[in-house]
Amino acid sequence: MRTYDILIIGGGCAGLSLAYHLQKTNTHQKIVILESREQYTNDKTWCFWEKNENLWTSLATKHWDQWSFHRDSDHQTIQHQSQIWKYYYLPAIKYYEYMTKAIRTNSNISLKMNTQVSKITKEKAPLLTPSETVYQLETNNDTYRALEVVDTRPQKKGESLLFQSFYGCHIELQASQSDDCVALMHNMRTDHTSFRFNYILPLSKTHILFEHTRFASEPLSEDLMKKECTSELKRLRIKHQKILRTEYGILPMGLNIKPSQFHTGGQRQGALRDASGYAFLRIQKWADAFSKELIKRSSHLTKPPKKRKKDLQKIMDTLFLKTLKRAPQNSSKIFISLAKNAKADLFSRFMSDQSSLIDKIRIIISMPPWPFLQTLFSNPLQPTTSQKTYD
């Protein structure tokens, strides 16, 4: 049985990105990726803000320099426009095709599709030094051994402050419309249990991605989100020829990440931005740094990296989510205030993890203080997370 140097569980965004960065080093290490899907399809969408052209912007099929916010209660609309930053749309299939093609140029890296990991055991490696161990992974197809394991599968169960549930439709419109501006958060409205809005990407003059999104204390079912998305399309009188495909997902916001006996990537490593759910560029940054860490060390890593200390942005995100959870009826007010007072470039820097300390202070003062002060002075011992299973 072959023993691999590195085994990556999951060939999604994080797993493929790590393998891609490893192959860029021309490594001679034997690496295998185990992916449960039979084949890659255009199953999701990644969006991000960027000011410089790079590989990811070149793979994107659409970008905008304008995005807007809208609240239903008073029909207030705030529009951002940037001369520096652009908002990019990257279909998953473009990413999968590029990454798998690049990975296959290195004969030391293999990708195994339709492979589900059922059991992982850790044991001493008899042919190695006494301090080294080997992992053995049982799958539906074969048994694999590896000196290092990186698990990039999403954590299926965990405590989270909030859950972002969404259902989206790629729609072919009956009539053409402007495709210059993204409806980033439109039709915002709240009740005492959740905050909801519509997210609309005009991919062409006759093709849009329409997503209905809700922030709630528990994940919402696909059937419910589909029903609400359909209702929104009717309410807004969006006339369409046909629905090309659909997307459904649940993003944990403020996930309490469980400790692991081996390395983790993607959502398990904290790639999801707590307050927004944006993850794509964070995953690329992690993959670049972690691939170099794996290669440069003369001996194999024996323990997963220590949990990172909370920085100011993490603290801000946590307070933000606790405030939305405590009083969801304030959500629209908070987001409209943020959109109105934080101009396009500041907003883009903050959303893309490139904000300075001054930027963070400006973000703080752009929002109404009272809801956050109420959260700060509320009972700190009161449980704030929910234990839920999500797919």
Model regions: which residues?
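Flavin (FAD/FMN) cofactor-binding and adjacent substrate-gating region
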Residues: E53-Q83, K101-A102, K119-S131, T193
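Long, low-complexity C-terminal extensions of enzymes
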Residues: Q284, D288-D391
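Predominantly flavin-linked oxidoreductase catalytic cores and closely associated redox partners
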Residues: N106-H240, I257
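N-terminal Rossmann-like FAD-binding beta1-loop-alpha1 element of flavoenzymes
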Residues: R2-V32
